[in-house]
Amino acid sequence: MKLGRFLQKRLYGGLVLGSFLMIIKISAAHHPNARVPEGTALDRYVYQSDAHFEYRLVRSMDAGKVHVHVLELTSQKWLTADEVDRPIWKHWLNIVVPKNVLSDTSLLFIGGGSNKSDSIDEPDEKLATIAAASGSVVSELKMVPNQPLVFADDGEERYEDALIAYSWDKYLKTGDDKWPARLPMTKAAVRAMDTVTEFCSTDKGGQISVRDFVVAGGSKRGWTTWTTAAVDKRVRAIFPIVIDMLNVVPSFKHHFNAYGFYAPAVGDYEAMGIMDWQDSPEYQKLMKIVEPFEYRDRLTMPKFMINATGDQFFLPDSWRFYYDQLEGPKNIRYVPNGEHSLRDTDAWETLMAGYFSIIHDLAIPELEWESASPGHLTAKVTGASPKAVKIWHADNPQARDFRVDTIGRNWVSQDVLPTDASGLNYNIQMDSPEKGWRAFMLEFTFKHPKSPVPLKMTTGVYVIPDTLPHLDNKGSL
């Protein structure tokens, strides 16, 4: 039986193990897990005490190999009732506890969703699978950010990027540190970790010790994955997903110079006039608060970035603006033919395999690469021999644009052999197309005997010819 149907039956069919309510207040006045409590406005906001912080156990149920606990988490108060219609942030927090717990590291997946409905958001089946396979607690935090929100001087219901763009506009015009929505989004994730640790230590939670976390999330929640790691020492590793925008200013100048316009996916920022602030001191101050690249000296934990070659927001060669400057263990994967949602791809297996490797101390292979000249790519693997290596490429004869919306799912692959008997060194030469542009990358597949699924990683994506057709245009974000 699928978990979703099982939960629906258990939640509403009378077979719930516990339908009691439990409210526990947790003090955040002195937080021992802060990396730099007074560092930036982000640090100060996250670790500012908030009497609204509490959780309520709504349901507990037996789901085969796991116990599932559904909690309502109140993470904070952001702004006032005079400024926004819903200042108190509430979330569903689904905690999946395997019956055989093997690790005190836990996965926290930061998710989205709407606060418009009172119905319980069911745990994602894939996350329950990861919990059972890994022998670790896996949690899913929903409604990050709380949405929709209606701001008093605006009157519109704002979701996702429209909400964030509005908050940026308020900061840029007022300079008030309270405005960037990344602050409450990050605080929600930190409070979720507090809640998981506290709840799991109770009788109802199974008296389980949760010592540290691997944090993951996609898009806006991928950005929050980075900032959560920047502020909290419990974060052991991160999997930021489809948030290929670190070092955002040069990255989005590159975006405009490649396209000659801003992709519709970032239209909410353009509509709010955010583009016009790019080179201003105000924008630089905003980036000091919310931009993960500004915290890179803190982000030394293992990090595995999962991106899409056909993302509607970000160019596939955006890695060039940040990857080499990240410190500590790092890997990246561009999912071929993936778009921003990563729907109908095997991206979740990368999260599962990578997480499994981290919590069970299985060495993740290291991949180094360089391109000495356009079209030339060398790569070296250490730590394990790949089971398969492919070169992927896609062409666009009309534009330097590889979005799925533009070229479809047109990436194709062929096998690549190593250059020597070690099986660890690879060297390829990709020719430029007769017309237009070609994007390409190398993909490596590894299979550890103790891991339930393969682990894939790639080089960064390269584009040939390495030219920007709209370099002389004026663009900003």
Task: Provide a role label for each language-model segment.
Residues 112-115, 138-190, 245-258:
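Cap/lid segment of the alpha/beta-hydrolase catalytic domain
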Residues 172-219, 235:
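Gly/Ser-rich "nucleophile elbow"/oxyanion-hole loop immediately N-terminal to the catalytic nucleophile
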Residues 353-393, 415-420:
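Surface beta-strand/loop "capping" patches
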Residues 50-100, 141, 177, 182:
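N-terminal cap/lid segment of alpha/beta-hydrolase-fold proteins
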Residues 227-276, 333-336, 342-346:
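Hydrolase active-site cap/lid region
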Residues 121-139:
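Short amphipathic alpha-helix adjacent to the substrate-entry channel of hydrolases
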Residues 92, 104-112:
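Short beta-strand element of the alpha/beta-hydrolase
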Residues 299, 305-307:
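Short beta-strand/loop motif that positions the catalytic acidic residue
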